[in-house]
Amino acid sequence: GVYDAAKTARGEQPGAYKRHDYVVGEHATGAPPEDVAQEMQELLEEVQSVAPQHVFTAAAYLHAKLENIHPFADGNGRTGRLLMNYFLLCNNHPPLIVHEQSRTEYYAALAQFDTHLQLGELKTYLKKQLLETWAQEIFCSVKNGMGQ
């Protein structure tokens, strides 16, 4: 399945905040379990009333901060990308795809936020993905005769 069975065995449940700390590579990942609910509440309050001219920045921040908090035992990346796109759509902006072939650049941009709390690299990356997503969509539409 899409949820890590070993984490289920430790009492973790899909859709629930994590109950344990996790290590990815050499580093502990995210907020301690006892801080997750408060940090998520603060994040949602921060982005709730963003001005229209700052929606893309807020979407990038929402995604980066969710990954930084790492609220779930598994599926944080998928959830963060989905939430970012939902936020964009709710604010009349198009969604985007984080393409597999550029994942190294994506992870580096997220690491830049984790290390320095800077969104510049992530915003640049996401803008490129937005353009690539919709260039491919337009190309496919024209190729299939929908552009007539």
Identify the residue ranges that each predicted region occupies.
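FIC/Doc superfamily catalytic core
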Residues: 1-74, 78-148
